[in-house]
Each structure stands twice: as structure tokens, then as C-alpha cells.
């Protein structure tokens, strides 16, 4: 991830391709691709119990999350490519990008707690909850347990990343199972 850190712009933006010769900063290189700056160090820590990579990337993750927060002050963002591979279904890009904004913010809050950064922990925990609430308020039909239009990605991404309210997880999971 040293290349990630080297390629990050001062404002927090990462390019589409890492390493890059300068290309990929002005495209839709948003959260669904560049969340690697947070997800990889966190999962290395979870798997190995080694926090070195998390420590090394902490300021970069923070700069990245702060950038997204500046461009998405309401907690929702459509910055990114979205789920562009499926031929027949189209997922809402604002839904998937906002979930990854939540993921990165939650990882940052957890890393802050682990590293004893109490003020950061409080701030980013509150921000993560704001994002989670914004996603659920806009995209979750609480009666049906369906996110967005109900396609697989729109159901699976909130489940995978723990956006779904506890009392609705079964319902959302059943809806996903119907799509598979």
C-alpha cells in the first residue's frame, strides 16, 4: 500500500490505477474502487493481528474520508463507478458509493479506537452513523426489506457491510436469496 500512499493527492483523492503516471485522478475513481486504502489495512489487521499497515495508512484513510465528507456533507455520494459490470441489472450508484463511504468511515473510527485516538474515534463513529442513517432513510423500504430496486448488489452490499438495521437483516437476506 506504499504506492497508494504515494499516489494520494493532498486533498485525499486516489487515482483509478495505482501506481499511475498521472492518469486517473479526474475520472469516477470513487469509493467502490479506491476504498482499498482502508479495507486492505483493516483486513490485514483482523487476519494477522498486525496493526503496522493500519498505522502507516491511518493519515491517508483520514484524508480520504475527509475528502468524501467535504463533497458529500449529507452522508450520501454518487462519486464512483458503481456496479458497472452486470448486463441486465443496474444498481443505484449513490447507494453503493454511500455504503463504501460508510465502510471507510467505520474502519477509520475502529482504527482510531485501536490506536488510542479518542477524539477521532468519537468524530468518525458519529459520521459513520450519520452515513448509515442517510443510506437507510433514502434506500431502505422497511416494510419490504428491499434496498433500492432490489437487485442483488443493492441487497448484498448493505448486508455485507452491516448497514442493515439488526431487526431487518433476515428480511433483507431473504430478498437477496430470491434474487440469486
Locate predicted features:
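Active-site core of glycosidic bond-cleaving carbohydrate-active enzymes
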Residues: 1-180
